[in-house]
Amino acid sequence: MEIFDKKGRLLFPDTERHRKMAAEKGILAQGKKILISQVFCSNGHPLVRPENPKFDQEPGIHLICEGNTFWQSVFLSPFQGDRQKQHKTDFKMGEILQIYCPECHVHFPKFAPHDCLPEAMYLALFLDQEANYYNTVCICNVWGCYSSFLRLAGEIFSEVRAQKSAR
């Protein structure tokens, strides 16, 4: 995205245009909360369905999480930054999980490393059915991680860049 026009003048963002583009991708503002209303696996299967358990009257994001000893359905809050989830049994704190689509069982692709554990990764969940990495939200694959909530891909790029420059 350009920040200057051809004559060198600063371009100001068209916030209404950005809001419309975000809404098309299922990102909606609800007061001070940001709702992610649609998420897909890399094969285009929807993870948010009306029958999913609700968080503040909005359906959660359905994932299958597999640890060392068992697997289960986990429903994440669809609100960015909200750590709530619904599940039957806790995994061991700090356990690395395999996370995949409940419909086709494809694993979510690795997006970027995370610093909570040496082998921790952010996994990409897509905001469109085309599996475009520019339109993703991410989750950490470590159970109980302090960042185990939805993060926008742009935030993760900034975080990784800051970590590398601090080294």
Language model: regions and residue ranges:
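Short, intrinsically disordered terminal segments enriched in charged and Pro/Gly residues
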Residues: 1-37, 54-71, 76-91, 152-167
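A cross-kingdom feature marking solvent-exposed beta-strand/loop segments within repeated
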Residues: 20-26, 84-86, 118-132
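Flanking scaffold residues of small Cys/His-coordinated metal-binding clusters
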Residues: 32-36, 93-96, 106-111, 132-135, ...
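Short cysteine-rich clusters marking metal-coordination/redox-active sites
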Residues: 38-43, 101-104, 114-116, 140
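Short functional micro-motifs and their immediate structural scaffolds
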Residues: 46-52, 106-110, 119-126, 145-150
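Short linker/helix segments within small regulatory modules
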Residues: 55-57, 89-96, 123-138
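Cysteine-rich micro-motifs
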Residues: 56-71, 98-104, 133-147
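Short, Lys/Arg-rich amphipathic alpha-helical interaction segments
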Residues: 130-167
